[in-house]
Amino acid sequence: MPNRNILYATTLVDELARAGLRHVCLAPGSRNTPLVLAFARHPAIRVFSHLDERSAAFFALGLALATDTPAAVVCTSGSAAANFFPAIVEAHQAGVPLLALTADRPHELRDSGANQTIDQVKMFGSFARWSVDVALPEAMPPPVALRNLRTLAARAMAIAGGEPRGVVHLNLPFRPPLEPTPMPGDLTEPPAAAQPRDDGAPYTCFLRSAPPAPPEAVIEPIAAVLEQHERGLIVCGPRCPGGAFGALVSELSQRTGYPALVDGVSGVRFGYPGVIGGYETFLFGEHAFPPPEVVLRFGAVLTSKWLNQYLDTAASPVVIHVRASGVWADDSHRVSHFVVADEAAFIRALIPRLTERQSAWRQRFVEAEARVWAAVEAGIADEPYFDGGAVYDVIDLLPEGASLFVGNSLPVRHLDQFGKPGVRHICAFANRGASGIDGNISTALGIGAGRPDAPLAAIVGDITFYHDMNGLLAVRRCGVPATIVLLNNDGGGIFHRLPINRFEPEFTDYFVTPHGLDFAHAAKMYGLEYVPVKDRTAFRSAFRASIDARAATLIELRTDARTDLVRRNALIQAARATGA
């Protein structure tokens, strides 16, 4: 080892890899040189180089979303670390495992006016589950200091990936020399205390058993409630667990006779039989459904305001929320039973205790769902083509196992309204923790890097695209081909749905904020093929060609926000008129 900094960084990074870290995003700088070299030289860790810290952090967030394991992001000192903050907020709010490693100046330079030096100790506050200001490397470290680096790495991975999942911040100060040059008085060979275990295992193994079935004391009261009420719902919000959960939801719906209403980014919308996705259209109107007597909830707070409003029409329903993380997610404050348990284990334990129910209630939802999608399909064929139609067609055209990222603001709501459930399994993602429009492109590309064998599509609005155009550099730099659908209504189209739209000129000038940008230039600069489309035939052709070729393509559909809203409302009214 040339010097103390390289020894410390190499020991820490080696143990992170042994604890399961496989992906890291590196932003260039000087103070983080020991960390950059340690990560770049480790054979078990895939390294992604980014020029910009904000994009790097969101890309790492996407990696963690795609792999369901912690990803790391590394930067130098100063405002570079502050640029991690938006992604860290999203990771905390959404329960995504993320490691933030920030290099820092030594303690004697803090609060001294030294260049590129800010207070980085616990700088992410309550948005980090664990923050550590790591000790400065020493020339002749005692064995316990080196063992601490390995247990620190193991603990960081365990906390980020445990329940509730979230952010771990390691702040690492270094004195020069930062490069791998010899330093007089430093150890020339790693001491025994720095060595890993001979068998390749982590220095500290955090062993988690498979989630046990909830005890009878938990299951029996819930089963009794469900048996008493025929008019119930299963509701799956964003960020439901993967694995067997979706199939178990379908089975539970069949057993209870409760329709399963699933959010577009719940992980249960696409690929699971019998789920309901057209609820926004048929719950209200002339053929409105009566409120449920019991609601069994999974996942985070719903995207759909209409579904939330419908659930709130119940006078005093039983609302049971099951969540392994134990994190509260009920902004209506209607939950009567909060169950902290592994969701799949809970359903497995519950199903045998229920009598299978042939339910006219569930059948009414199934029939309404069929009528809704028939009306939607007929309406989308009409001109002019609009944003919701494009989202419907993306779902129709994506192949089995594809990755889909939907941007916040309108696209995620379009997915909830126009993303038809189907037999093909599509992994749909969105940043619904803090629901910001920043970093969406970078998150999408991180997802593509984390699922390299799956085609990647992203649907974003023009303001979202503008916010993260620099993230497009990862298409070439990190080798992530993506089909990006840009729904360009020249400003903040979502504000047309709010009462402020009646107040001009402030509405246009300060809310819609039309920009008139030509995004073809951005596509050219970042090496994407640019395909402008105006109608459904052109869109479907361009999208299918890009996905089939695994090409890097920007498909731009220019729309008018007012026309889009009129088309959407007319389509919903037409669907309701069918009796759905």
Curated annotation (Swiss-Prot):
CDD domains: TPP_PYR_MenD, TPP_SHCHC_synthase. GO terms for biological process: menaquinone biosynthetic process. Binds 1 thiamine pyrophosphate per subunit. It catalyses: isochorismate + 2-oxoglutarate + H(+) = 5-enolpyruvoyl-6-hydroxy-2-succinyl-cyclohex-3-ene-1-carboxylate + CO2. InterPro entries: DHS-like_NAD/FAD-binding_dom, MenaQ_synth_MenD, MenD_middle, THDP-binding, Thiamin_PyroP_enz_TPP-bd_dom, TPP_enzyme_TPP-bd. Homodimer. Catalyzes the thiamine diphosphate-dependent decarboxylation of 2-oxoglutarate and the subsequent addition of the resulting succinic semialdehyde-thiamine pyrophosphate anion to isochorismate to yield 2-succinyl-5-enolpyruvyl-6-hydroxy-3-cyclohexene-1-carboxylate (SEPHCHC). NCBIfam families: menD (TIGR00173). This is 2-succinyl-5-enolpyruvyl-6-hydroxy-3-cyclohexene-1-carboxylate synthase. The lineage of its organism: Bacteria, Bacillati, Chloroflexota, Chloroflexia, Chloroflexales.
